[in-house]
């Protein structure tokens, strides 16, 4: 009997700790620190390669819509650099922008090459000519890139259950991304 109670207690504690082990590091803040992507109704654009997989392009379009729902500001999706700050999103497989950043040593190739379903999100200073700073979401493959995009949406305040269960979107005036590298 004592063994059974110990076993039940062990199982309950394990199930309570399990969600905290899988939770992604919090990289989005609603204060004006780090890389401020959206503030006062203005958003920096999202740069994505047209050669990117259709699933990634759809996730980028969803991110654009989600940003509008959260802040009221809808970022523009662009295919060549424009302006001094932006989000750069792509996979190692298909994005010329991500390949260029890896070749220049601005994002670590070792974190992505040969990996499956992995992404990094990090701030990069002067990622391409004419751009002062960017947040880069780079995936090892299509799924990794999509995971990174939807993790950003989730941390902004859009529940994965928004579409299916009508979970309300958290409204914020500011979306900032902390100056650090996040991987998953």
Model-assigned labels for residue ranges:
Residues 1, 182-184:
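Accessible peptide chain termini
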Residues 1-7:
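Positively charged n-region of N-terminal signal peptides that target proteins for export
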Residues 8-20:
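Bacterial N-terminal signal peptides
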Residues 23-182:
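Contiguous, structured surface segment used for ligand recognition
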């Amino acid at each position: 009997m004592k063994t059974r109670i110990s076993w039940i207690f062990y199982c309950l504690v394990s199930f309570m700790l399990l969600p905290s082990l899988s939770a992604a590091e919090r990289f989005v803040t609603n204060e004006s620190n780090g890389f401020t992507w959206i503030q006062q109704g203005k958003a920096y654009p999202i740069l994505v390669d047209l050669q990117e997989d259709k699933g990634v392009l759809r996730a980028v379009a969803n991110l654009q819509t989600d940003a509008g729902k959260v802040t009221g500001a809808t970022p523009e999706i662009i295919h060549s650099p424009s302006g001094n700050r932006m989000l750069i999103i792509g996979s190692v497989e298909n994005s010329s922008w991500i390949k260029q950043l890896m070749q220049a040593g601005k994002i670590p190739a070792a974190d992505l090459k040969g990996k499956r379903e992995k992404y990094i999100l990090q701030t990069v200073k002067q990622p391409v000519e004419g751009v002062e700073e960017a947040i880069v979401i780079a995936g090892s493959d299509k799924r990794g890139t999509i995971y990174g995009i939807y993790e950003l949406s989730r941390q902004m305040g859009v529940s994965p259950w928004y579409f299916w269960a009508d979970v309300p979107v958290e409204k914020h005036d500011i979306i900032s991304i902390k100056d650090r590298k996040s991987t998953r």
